[in-house]
Amino acid sequence: MSKGTSSDTSLGRVSRAAFPSPTAAEMAEISRIQYEMEYTEGISQRMRVPEKLKVAPPNADLEQGFQEGVPNASVIMQVPERIVVAGNNEDVSFSRPADLDLIQSTPFKPLALKTPPRVLTLSERPLDFLDLERPPTTPQNEEIRAVGRLKRERSMSENAVRQNGQLVRNDSLWHRSDSAPRNKISRFQAPISAPEYTVTPSPQQARVCPPHMLPEDGANLSSARGILSLIQSSTRRAYQQILDVLDENRRPVLRGGSAAATSNPHHDNVRYGISNIDTTIEGTSDDLTVVDAASLRRQIIKLNRRLQLLEEENKERAKREMVMYSITVAFWLLNSWLWFRR
């Protein structure tokens, strides 16, 4: 018996020495890991909110207090179904805010928004700010509007004719008709008859004449009509300058030599007479102003495109000349080097 008891005591000592008891910190770490694993498993597998969250370390008194209904032991997790503003003007500390009542009682007016277009094309219609002041519909306005439509259609047809080279032929006819009378020609007069040629002035020249500037047009810039008249006059002036430059550049090509240095007085007299008659006959209606401004704007856009094409052609020609010059210089340098090597 003594041997058995001594052996048991020796085994207990060896086991205690080989496997020491865990400390309090190790026990706390083990419990924390176990709690985290259970918490993660409950969230990931069962997908539910935990019933409670402990706010104090585990203690027997707290557990007993929780069982007795003490609220300090844990916090019950409850997700509310809805959130309502506390108070209905019954409690002074939790009264209903006045801003909420104001927001709910204020009716919201719907806003009519128009989607802007992706592409703005000036050739289809004039700008919207030109139609701010529309006069009341009267028979006179209808007649003026019809005249404006006729002018627009006529200008479009004349643009097509000018693209086909009619302007060059008319210009040559002006110089070849020496027996024609040298007086002022109006759009509303009969065409000039000559023994060989018959020349009819183009109404397109009457549209490119300088505008008739009234003194009140420049001063009355506070109204929309004054702004429209200023835009029209400045646009016509710029367009006339561009046409003069193009005429000067075109004269050496069409007539060449000495004819390019001198201008045609008959042509200048005709243009001057047409400009004077046009300034006296042209009305002051808003519709005609809008039509003229839109047509002049389209013509200026076309001229700008032509000038851009000419500039691009000049740049390409300069590049080609530079490349050819470089190739020529390199060729002669190579030939000279080979000649010196011999």
Curated annotation (Swiss-Prot):
Q: Which positions are tagged coiled coil?
A: 291-322
Among InterPro entries, the record links this protein to: Mff-like_dom, Mff/Tango-11
How would you describe this protein's topology in the membrane? Single-pass type IV membrane protein
Q: What is its main location?
A: mitochondrion
Compartmental location: Mitochondrion outer membrane; Peroxisome; Cytoplasmic vesicle, Secretory vesicle, Synaptic vesicle
Cytoplasmic compartment residues: 1-322
Annotated positions of the Phosphothreonine modification: 115, 200
Q: Could you cite one Gene Ontology molecular function of this protein?
A: protein homodimerization activity
Q: Name one GO biological process term.
A: mitochondrion organization
Question: Which keywords accompany this UniProt record?
Answer: Coiled coil, Cytoplasmic vesicle, Membrane, Mitochondrion, Mitochondrion outer membrane, Peroxisome, Phosphoprotein, Synapse, Transmembrane, Transmembrane helix
- Residues that span the membrane, as ranges: 323-340
Residue positions of the PTM Phosphoserine? 155, 157, 172, 202, 229, 233, 295
Tissue specificity, in the record's words, reads: Highly expressed in heart, kidney, liver, brain, muscle, and stomach.
Q: Name one Pfam family in it.
A: Miff
Q: Which residues lie on this side of the membrane: Mitochondrial intermembrane?
A: 341-342
Give a GO cellular-component term: mitochondrial membrane
Q: Which family does it belong to?
A: Belongs to the Tango11 family.
Give the function comment from the record.
Answer: Plays a role in mitochondrial and peroxisomal fission. Promotes the recruitment and association of the fission mediator dynamin-related protein 1 (DNM1L) to the mitochondrial surface. May be involved in regulation of synaptic vesicle membrane dynamics by recruitment of DNM1L to clathrin-containing vesicles.
Implicated disorder: Encephalopathy due to defective mitochondrial and peroxisomal fission 2: An autosomal recessive disorder characterized by delayed psychomotor development, severe hypotonia with inability to walk, microcephaly, and abnormal signals in the basal ganglia. More variable features include early-onset seizures, optic atrophy, and peripheral neuropathy.
Q: What PANTHER family does the record point to? A: MITOCHONDRIAL FISSION FACTOR, TRANSPORT AND GOLGI ORGANIZATION PROTEIN 11
Summarize subunit and interaction data from the UniProt record for this chain: Homodimer. Interacts with DNM1L. Interacts with C11orf65/MFI; the interaction inhibits MFF interaction with DNM1L.
**What protein am I looking at?**
Mitochondrial fission factor
The root-end lineage is: Eukaryota, Metazoa, Chordata, Craniata, Vertebrata
